[in-house]
Amino acid sequence: MRKVAIIGAGAAGMTAAITAASNGAEVVVLEHMDRVGKKILSTGNGRCNFTNTYQDRSCYHSDNESFPWKIIEKFNAEQIIKLFEELGVYAKNRNGYMYPYSDQASSVTEALKMELERLQIDVRLQTECTDIFPRKKGFTLQIVKDGKKGKIYADHVILCTGSRAFPASGSDGSGYDLAKKLGHKIIPVLPALVQLRCEEKFFKSIAGVRVQGTVSIWSENQCLAKDTGELQLTNYGISGIPVFQVSRYAAI
């Protein structure tokens, strides 16, 4: 039996673990936080839009336009929806965004967690992978738990650590270092799907208000991007799907 070590127990890590175990692999999942799927709970404003039905090349912005399609053609929205139905999570379509019927991100987290348990996958919480060493056959992973060092041997390693976008959820950038040690090149990253801060001081007095509107990004009297939908006013500025859609232009 092939052994697969997965670093990170977010949405990608748990899905990879379930897929590998369902295909006969022995799986161990290493997660340095105290629970799995922590960042999932924040997605979609706590409702978790886990896929979308509109997937077109114009939606993906990259110097390598074909890159996303290598993945999407193998695992598309229909397959994602089917996967969650098999786990007991049925989807509702809201303008192309697919949410769990409960409108609770915790439904997604719990479904994935229960499937890990059903498949008896070895999930090790508060366990950090500090280094990976390739061997002639497989890999040696150096781990630390409660200050004690250890080693794990695996035939395959799947790195699912995420970026450094949300350290409080576990996405602290530690995966970049592991990737570099394995010879991968890290492309400089910029915020691409984030809230926007505003200079005006009145936002604190209207924090929590939701309103339908249009948000636009301007530079040198030129509109770079705009989008319409539900805006969420926060104590620091604006959030919501339209803001996320245009935020990458602010980062650039």
Task: Label each residue range with its predicted role.
Residues 6, 10-11, 35, 163-165:
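Residue-level detector of alpha-helix initiation sites
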Residues 21-45:
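Glycine-rich FAD pyrophosphate-binding loop
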Residues 2-29:
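N-terminal Rossmann-like FAD-binding beta1-loop-alpha1 element of flavoenzymes
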Residues 114-252:
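Predominantly flavin-linked oxidoreductase catalytic cores and closely associated redox partners
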Residues 68-76, 95-114, 166-171, 201:
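Short beta-strand to alpha-helix junction loop
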Residues 86-114, 118, 226, 241-244:
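Mobile, glycine/GP-rich and aromatic-enriched active-site lid/loop segments adjacent to catalytic centers
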Residues 45-95:
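Glycine-rich active-site loop/strand segments that organize a redox cofactor
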